[in-house]
């Protein structure tokens, strides 16, 4: 999504700091340590600032439900199981995914500074929000960051109709002379959160996103939630590359779930369930170990400019680079506030009443 400043009457703008404080207030009331609550809040607010409504504050209910049900450990003993100069295997002890992810990426950054490459894999975690959050942590340090996670089964493999794969996102961020390059994508056509947005708004989904329980392409969001499945990136069949999205999803499961000794998407559970066992993969490359950082920035910026200034199709206003829309949307929302859908705002105020804190 790219916001230029206009939102319709179904949205209420909330200042970033007010939304951040609200999330921290809710989580600390439930017993989450303040430092951890701030990490979760920062992740959710960044998603909303960047226009990723599917992974923003609308996710708070999922985390609250997970905490109340006992599916999330509020005081996890996040520990290193195995470690070497350039790698580590982490056990998240069923903690909040954002906290496990943040600490894992911090460790990967440290190892990359020391050795040139840092790889940290985490198991026994929970949903960690937007993958790009962690990749950007490395880019802000002048490094290349890669982040992946598996997730509960929501996607059918090419040729199948059963939910076996997760939406299994991949993110890569790299520094440039301007804002970082940021690729942040699900390996399904869309993440499940986008369907949740359509469901709240009572809208049909675009054709090609998902199938129903019989395996037929559907635009009815309830058919997807009632036994249907999302399609892998590339869509139905192999003609437009659905098998490639399917393969990318498997890659994420191999690197995060299987390599960590955890589990793969078919056996990952929802946040509200005990032992959801989400697994993450983080990799950091210290550019200075290969070429000077300024040379890297010069070359990547030149590449981006050459792409953006190339001949455009007449139906498009401009050629975008990955992450660019998010940074422009962030500038708008930092000035005007974050637009929150009215039904989501009502849900957030219900959460506030439920836990006994001041609402929005």
Curated annotation (Swiss-Prot):
It catalyses: (S)-malate + NAD(+) = oxaloacetate + NADH + H(+). Keywords: Cytoplasm, NAD, Oxidoreductase, Tricarboxylic acid cycle. One of its GO terms (biological process) is tricarboxylic acid cycle. The keyword Nuclease does not apply. One of its GO terms (cellular component) is cytoplasm. SUPFAM superfamilies: L-sulfolactate dehydrogenase-like. Its EC number is 1.1.1.37. GO terms for molecular function: L-malate dehydrogenase (NAD+) activity. It is found in: Cytoplasm. It is an enzyme of class 1 (oxidoreductase). Belongs to the LDH2/MDH2 oxidoreductase family. Homodimer. This is Malate dehydrogenase. It comes from Pyrococcus horikoshii (strain ATCC 700860 / DSM 12428 / JCM 9974 / NBRC 100139 / OT-3). The gene is mdh.
